């Protein structure tokens, strides 16, 4: 792990800082994963310049060549898909570099070796319904460096909660991603940026929306926040079609501050 050189840090900071700019608009190639078929809006247009959309069977990734991680990952979960995922028990576990990305733009397996970080799924393997979609979830384009105490415990609890809630309510849109806040950004081997936090936004049609954000630390600090607050902090609006009132509301979501030993799914 290394601190980034000043010039590189300035470049990354410029690309990741939340700027007062017009949202980036681009037609998505995989609308079924998004609420109302509309992809998240990048409030900071600089993020879009280095971004590539990767469509998969059960999720879509917007990958950044600056961070060499996803900017976000979006999923549409249904009662049917979660039931299928729960009945599929042949998890793949074959992490791999994504061949759809140029080598210079993507993470490699070697970047994570002896790094001290887990390879944390943004779209969890536990949401995948079959062999092909599960293999896709182990692409490093769907992965961020995540502290093991978070990844294996309370973050896994959150993922399971979202699946359970979907089984109860029948339909949910989920957008997950890393946040890079503050002036000091570290990287694995000077290549893969280490997020300061990871977040998950949830929208249940007819019920409302909100988000969780957790610091990427051994003792994670969890917050339940509004979609508006998430957008302010990350520069990403996960659900552009929602009303301003819906985005401003802080939901009555449970917290996941208690870390219990669970296998990351």
Indicate where each model-derived feature is located:
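Domain-level detector for secreted/extracellular nuclease and nuclease-toxin modules, and
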Residues: 5-6, 13-265
């Amino acid at each position: 792990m290394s601190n980034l050189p000043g010039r590189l840090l300035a470049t990354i900071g410029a690309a990741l800082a939340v700027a007062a700019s017009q949202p980036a608009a681009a037609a998505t190639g995989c609308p079924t994963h998004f609420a109302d078929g509309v992809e998240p809006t990048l409030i900071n247009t600089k993020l879009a310049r280095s971004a590539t959309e990767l469509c998969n069977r059960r999720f879509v990734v917007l990958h950044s060549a600056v961070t060499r991680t996803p900017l976000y990952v979006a999923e549409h979960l249904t009662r049917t898909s979660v039931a299928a995922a729960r009945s599929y028990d042949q998890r793949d576990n074959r992490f791999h570099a994504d061949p759809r990305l140029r080598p210079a733009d993507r993470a490699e397996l070697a970047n994570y070796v002896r790094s001290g970080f887990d390879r944390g799924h943004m779209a969890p393997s536990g949401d995948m319904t079959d062999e092909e979609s599960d293999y896709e979830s182990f692409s490093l384009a769907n992965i961020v460096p995540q502290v093991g105490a978070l990844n294996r415990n309370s973050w896994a609890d959150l993922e399971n909660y979202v699946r359970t809630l979907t089984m109860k309510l029948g339909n949910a849109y989920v957008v997950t991603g890393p946040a890079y806040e503050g002036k000091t950004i570290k990287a694995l081997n000077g290549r893969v940026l280490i997020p300061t936090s990871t977040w998950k936004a949830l929208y249940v049609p007819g019920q409302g929306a909100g988000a969780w954000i957790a610091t990427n630390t051994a003792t994670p600090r969890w917050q339940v926040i509004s979609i508006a607050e998430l957008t302010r902090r990350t520069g990403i609006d996960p659900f552009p079609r929602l009303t301003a009132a819906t985005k401003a509301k802080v939901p009555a979501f449970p917290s996941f501050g208690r870390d219990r030993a669970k296998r990351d799914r």
